Amino acid sequence: MTLQGSLTHEEYCAALLAETDRLREIVRTADLSATVPTCPDWTLAELARHVGGAHRWTGTIVATRASESVDPADVPGGAGPEDKGAAALDAWLAEGVEQTVAALREAGPDTEVWSWTTARNTGFWARRMVHETVIHRADAALAAGVPFDVPAPVAADCLEEWLQIGELPMVVARFAERGGELLGPGRTIHVHATDAPPGLDAEWLLDLTGAAPAHRRTHEKAAVALRGPLTDVLQVLYRRLPADSDRVEVLGERALLDQWLEWATFG
């Protein structure tokens, strides 16, 4: 099991800047005291501080070539600006992501650093921060009541990363603690993005018939299929959109999809 992405290191760096810019636009224009429906313990301001703190934490890991986890309390500026206003929060987000991207670009994708996975390199962090920002931008868009969409290559890679992380042994073990008989004969899930542009392979089969979850990119019949626009399918898997939304279609054993989503929730 690898955590190989489909974009180049520079494409991840550019996407991280672009996704943060889109988040910042929401921060500048929305009610920062609004509760985030998909993260109900947070206001929009707290969500933005979480994302900006994650950027700076990652930037510190990369810039210092950390060989072990970094205490968030040791990250310069990691707690966010003292000023609670939108302008200060926007400027803090911009400064943090620029510092992090500069560190990622300087390091390149293959520099060894600590991570919580088997992929102990800077390339892992470039990809992870893009998709951390994508999903929390979805949260912010929900809180602000504004549309949410993701460029197709980024959305497909975000979905692929979700499946890859869900197959890591330490993650599978954590999921298994939630109980339930998820694995077994005939338990397969087909995910199909119906609006993928030509050349983008945006169909996956999640195979739950073996000793651990596995996936492959293929068009293949399954016990249940989730179909819809790529951004919407991604949100369903990350539980930012309910599977019974009229924006997606579920065909077959709906209970299996629901069980998987409950079992494999993270992020």
Predicted ranges, named:
Residues 194-230:
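Acidic/His-leaning functional-site neighborhoods
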Residues 1-6:
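Glycine/alanine-rich phosphate-binding loops at beta-alpha junctions
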Residues 219-267:
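C-terminal interaction segments
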Residues 72-84, 154-168, 253-265:
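Short, mixed-charge aromatic SLiMs
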Residues 162-206:
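A glycine-rich beta-turn/hairpin centered on an aromatic-Pro dipeptide
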Residues 11-81, 85-91, 95-96, 100:
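Active-site-proximal cofactor/substrate-binding loop regions of enzyme domains
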Residues 31-72, 117-176, 233:
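Short, contiguous alpha-helical
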Residues 81-111, 122-132, 139, 182-190, ...:
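Acidic/histidine-rich alpha-helical segments that form the ligand environment
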